[in-house]
Swiss-Prot record:
This is Golgi-associated RAB2 interactor protein 4. The keyword Metal-binding does not apply. RAB2B effector protein required for the compacted Golgi morphology, probably through interaction with small GTPase RAB2B. The keyword GTP-binding does not apply. It comes from Macaca fascicularis. One of its GO terms (biological process) is Golgi organization.
Amino acid sequence: MNGDSLLPYYTAQSGSSMSMFNTTMGRLQRQLYKGEYDIFKYAPIFGSDFIQITKRGEVIDVHNRVRMVTMGIARTSPILPLPDVMLLARPATGCEEYAGHGQATKRKKRKAAKNLELTRLLPLKFVRISVHNHEKQQLRLKFATGRSCYLQLCPALNTRDDLFAYWEKLIYLLRPPMESNSSTCGIPAEDMMWMPVFQEDRRSLEAVDLQGKGDQDQVSIRSLHMVSEVCGATSAAYAGGEGLQHDFHKPTNVLNVSIPKTSTELAEEPATGVTKEAAAAGAAAGAATGTVAGALSVAAANSAPGQVSVAIAGVATIGAGGSKSNMAIAGTASMAPNSTKVAVAGAAGKSSEHVSSTSMSLSREGSMSLAIAGVELTSRTAAETDMDAAAGLPVSTRQSKSSLSGQHGRERTQASAEACKEGRERREKDKALGRSSRRRRTGESRHKTRGDKIARKSSSRSSFSHRASRDGKKEKGCSSPGSSRHGESHKGVSHTPISKESRTSHKSGRSSSTTSSGSSKRLGRISSFLRNVRANLTTKAVGTPHGRDVDIMAKTVERSTNVANAETAEGGQGLEMVGSMTPDIMETMTFETH
């Protein structure tokens, strides 16, 4: 073996598996060494001459010539442990070869510029090489397109006798599962059998992992889906033989909280520092929606070290059997280095009876203080509550407001315990009669029900409404002379029969079933009726000073508020008519009865 026939940089210590390349340069390698292709100028190539045969082993002759094929296996980079490219060449035009089994004869018609013509360059991952017949030294090449060809070794006279054994060893090195660093090395024959070219691998994306150990500088084509993990990977053949250091960074400031069922519990996930506190703030804000089914979305942005801004948006629904049909919540949160503040505003659907605002302060130690301010019949409005929440009032101030509201409600509830019992008894008695009367009457008769006991004892004549007179006749009402004379003395003031059922209905909160448009119309009618009732009270209380009438009205309003609050606590539903005039009207009529 002459030193000139070896590649300049190749030695036997380059790799045990590459010892087969420590042979004399073949025709293909000598031709490429001339520099026709720079990538193969110093590439070690193991090549031999073959003749093309059929599957049955018959020689294929085209125009009475044997088809000669020179196949070479090359390694394009010295750092690759295995070869990665297969080269196919044929005799150039002007150089014809006729080969037999174990013998070769040449006849040159003219002097050719080159002996071989390179026709194919295929990565070994797209080719499966196998032994077709060991005795006849036949190989089988199966390409990724599905086509196959069969080659029979045709060595020269001066070649080694164990040349085919080297090919078998090379095939064995390319067949095992890939555990090398090169992605362009040959894929195992069994795995490559049914894989078409450029067809996506049907394996699950979760099962696909990067193949290789140590300094991985190339990846398999089967891992090309995983863009985030193979970014920056390249072939060492075109990088000057230098490996690349891969450092796949993962985002650290990403917060993604998904809560299928809104609750106060947060999934146990590894989180540190800012991310953990932002997630805890989102979970605490989600508690405003209760335990109803819904979804809560939390988005966090890290504006500065130790500071996080959180935006919260969520929806909630209750089944057909529930009292509410939907619910919505929206809020913002800001986290300082030592504490977390959350402001949440929610709205409930179906009756639109309550709008609440929640403010929370969360410290690093884990203690949490929560204050809730809501809209009540006699408390602040929803707009004021939202303004306080947006302004960021201190927690102590909001807590004091909430506690005062709760104490006032408890006092009114205790004072109206007896009135609640009366209201319950009257509602049970009048439920059947109230349903039938509501269907037949419209307009002003909607505020009145049949079975009025007060109308049978005392009712006034009205010249303003004929419908009220007809209702009085149907219900067998008797007009009072005193009240009639009083009605004639006041010009422009109409008197209608006062029904006990109507007072009971207003007192028990029956008006919650009407719409907001109907309530606005009723307020206009009731305002005129209030003036009439006040006039009646003034006429009856002869010799009573004006200051007493004012006291009576104040007591009436206080009593009406107590009844409304007690019914809200029992039924769990708020009243729709929350105007301050409605309780005045209802309880004024009640005072006249008692």
